């Protein structure tokens, strides 16, 4: 919580605090948790209501304030909490919110003399989130900064008006603890992929949906990665883009009609009689199974892709499938880079984390067991209590 009263500006170069800390986060694999600022009650026309530097970082966790702690409901943005959008490369700012105190329910702060101080501000909500992420880091067998950012966005509690208030609340109210997220119920499974990708490579990851599963399914996917930054490029600040593609069914391909035909392309099961009939009639099939759109891009041109999050370092998607629409589904990841607005071909590697949740809305009670039986390579995270050293006048004690 640095305290500069400087709101993000789209057409200006990033503040030095923002650029330096972003580059440090990229080079040293550090996650900074930053208070979003306390000017959210400024008039929107002034622009002063937006998140304050360095909360506009692309590689950090920026935290706003809400008016009620978890699990109290209803909850909303605290009136003073600064709002998004952030700068290009990290438009969803703050990443999320947590209780920071409001006039009729202040935040209790313990003074060094043992007395309490009542206050409010994002400078109090940010340390609460820092504590939760630090505890999570001690529970996971393998972490990097991207893992922590992915968990924060993935398990945020969505507001009932999530889309309409995303500039206010980001991905939602952030957890006080991630311990429960490490325990899956019988109708769900959470799987974490931690890897790195070189420019030009394509990586594939099979989604943990068992072949015997014939029910409807809900899938949540969060991608987080660290990116080098270009401090002199206000609108092209992040240099790396990881393109995420979902292919839900191994046998569903795109069939195109013969040249000159007036018929439209169609998606057909490659193993079906219809597919064989089309092929003998001169139709051609795609080389890869069809994809499921994860973004809201209106088209494939660069402007629409950029607006839909192509260069954002943190993305969260939720998709639903009817029974039979998933078969050996996989995610594919491709890495692009740019420099000064043009595609860059110099070799680099980008570390990333993908967090996937699969749930059965019909509550059949067998999904987790089926996943564990089919995907033997997956290992459940062991619950470990973090050890904390307390300093006292007598001796150091571990608890």
Language-model features and meaning:
Residues 3, 33-35, 63, 97-99, ...:
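Generic beta-strand/beta-sheet core signal
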Residues 1, 27-29, 57-59, 86-93, ...:
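Subtilisin-like serine protease catalytic core
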Residues 237-252, 267, 277, 294-296, ...:
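C-terminal edge strands of extracellular/lumenal beta-sandwich accessory domains
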Residues 218-303:
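Extended low-complexity, serine/threonine- and proline-enriched intrinsically disordered segments
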Residues 138-218:
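C-terminal subdomain of the subtilisin-like protease fold in secreted/lumenal serine endopeptidases
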Residues 1-55, 118-120, 124-126:
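Substrate-binding/access-modulating region of protease and related hydrolase catalytic domains
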Residues 49-134:
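Extracellular S/T/G-rich loop segment that most often corresponds to the catalytic His/Ser-adjacent loop
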Residues 6, 36-40, 66-69, 102, ...:
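Acidic, glycine-rich active-site loops and adjacent beta-strand->loop/helix elements
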């Amino acid at each position: 919580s640095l305290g500069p009263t400087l709101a993000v500006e789209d057409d200006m170069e990033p503040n030095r605090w923002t650029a330096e800390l972003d580059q440090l986060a990229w080079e040293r694999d550090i996650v900074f948790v930053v208070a979003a600022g306390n000017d959210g009650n400024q008039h929107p026309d002034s622009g002063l209501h937006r998140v304050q530097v360095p909360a506009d970082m692309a590689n950090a966790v920026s935290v706003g304030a809400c008016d009620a702690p978890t699990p109290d409901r209803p909850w909303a943005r605290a009136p003073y909490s600064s709002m998004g959008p952030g700068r290009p490369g990290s438009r969803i700012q703050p990443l999320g919110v947590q209780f920071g105190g409001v006039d009729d329910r202040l935040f209790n702060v313990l003074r060094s003399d043992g007395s309490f101080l009542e206050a409010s501000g994002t400078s109090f909500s940010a340390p609460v989130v820092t504590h939760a992420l630090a505890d999570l880091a001690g529970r996971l067998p393998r972490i990097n900064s991207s893992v922590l950012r992915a968990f924060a966005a993935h398990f945020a509690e969505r507001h009932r008006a999530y889309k309409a208030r995303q500039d206010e609340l980001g991905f939602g109210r952030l957890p006080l603890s991630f311990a429960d997220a490490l325990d899956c119920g019988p109708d769900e499974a959470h799987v974490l992929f931690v890897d790195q990708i070189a420019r030009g490579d394509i990586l594939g990851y099979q989604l943990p949906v068992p072949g015997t599963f014939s029910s409807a399914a809900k899938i949540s996917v969060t991608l987080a990665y660290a990116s080098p930054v270009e401090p002199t490029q206000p609108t092209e600040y992040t240099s790396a883009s990881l393109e995420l593609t979902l292919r839900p069914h191994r046998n569903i391909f795109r069939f195109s009609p013969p040249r000159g035909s007036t018929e439209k392309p169609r998606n057909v099961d490659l193993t079906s009689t219809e597919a064989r009939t089309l092929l003998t009639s001169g139709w051609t099939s795609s080389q890869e199974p069809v994809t499921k759109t994860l973004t809201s891009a209106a088209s494939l041109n660069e402007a629409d892709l950029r607006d839909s999050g192509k260069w954002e370092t943190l993305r969260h998607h939720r998709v639903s499938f009817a029974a039979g629409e998933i078969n050996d589904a996989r995610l594919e990841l491709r890495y692009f880079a740019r420099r000064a607005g043009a595609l860059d071909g110099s070799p680099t590697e980008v570390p990333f984390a993908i967090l996937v949740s699969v749930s059965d809305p019909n509550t059949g009670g067998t999904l987790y067991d089926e996943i564990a039986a089919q995907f033997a390579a997956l290992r459940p995270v062991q619950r470990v209590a973090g050890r904390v050293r307390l300093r006292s006048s007598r001796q150091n004690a571990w608890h």
